[in-house]
A protein has these predicted regions:
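ATP/pyrophosphate-binding catalytic subdomain of soluble kinases
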Residues: 1-33
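ATP/nucleoside-binding phosphotransfer catalytic cores, i.e., glycine-rich phosphate-binding loops
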Residues: 52-115
Length: 115
């Protein structure tokens, strides 16, 4: 199902969007995140998790700046460097599960429930 439609149909309390940029450099990451934002992927988001990456920064843009450039105007919390994606420890998230994210003193916890 298309993500914006899923959020409207199934996520009454908001949608937690989680992504990672894998091996993409900062400019590619910014471009892809802008495209997702313009396509409506974050319209019903209540928060965004971005997985940690080993991908390179660009000469004039870091990975963090890429996320801020593309998503900084969203009025939702954005957590960077989450332990999800292609960088160890590869913590799994379950698509469609309910989730609660807390961040205290730079330490984040994601709690998921099924059903």
């Amino acid at each position: 199902m298309y993500v914006p439609a899923y959020g409207r149909a199934h996520a009454d309390e908001g949608l937690l969007v989680y992504l990672e940029v894998c091996e993409h450099g900062a400019y590619d990451a910014a471009r892809q995140l802008h495209a997702l934002r313009l396509a409506g992927w974050f319209d019903d988001a209540s928060g965004v998790l971005i997985g940690r990456t080993a991908a390179p920064d660009a000469e004039k843009m870091t990975q963090r700046e890429a996320v801020a450039d593309a998503l900084g105007m969203l009025d939702v919390p954005i957590v960077l460097d989450a332990d999800i994606g292609h960088t160890q420890p590869f913590l799994p998230l379950v698509n469609g599960a309910s989730a609660r994210v807390t961040v205290t003193d730079g330490v984040g916890v994601v709690t998921q429930t099924l059903g």
